[in-house]
Amino acid sequence: MVMPMEAILLPMYIEMSQLDWVNSLPALVVPSIAKCFSIYMFYNFFKDIPDDLLEAASIDGSSPIRTFFSIVMPISKTVYATVFILDFVAHWNDFMWPFLVMTGKDKRTIQLAVQSFFGTQPVHYSAIMASLVLSAIPMIVMFVFMQKYYVEGIASSGIKG
């Protein structure tokens, strides 16, 4: 959260190469599982859940795992949706990390494929613009359907601004 991604690219790449994950899907997915901002949003949401609610479940005989899945998860779907949207948009638009770890042309992300248009002679601006529009469609569709959760999640996570 405090350290920019560019500062940790080299150590992360060395880690991925030691695990022999370069040019594989885990190299894209695993580094993004526990991002600091996502943990911060979950922490702010979960600390505001009333203790009375959890105590009532405990008094009713609910185990901690059942309390989590029956009470905490349903009331926290807005923060889950918000984290999903923010992480999806960040990873969908990410260029530098996939550029480092995905070496094969068959496993390129959409941003790497768009960048490959710039290396051709002559530059086909119509193809570039069409690919950029196509790359934006999934984010627009997702935001239209999840806008309610996004706004509620930002409001309930404690981010002021």
For each of these PLM feature ranges, what is it?
Residues 1-161:
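A hydrophobic, multi-pass inner-membrane permease signature
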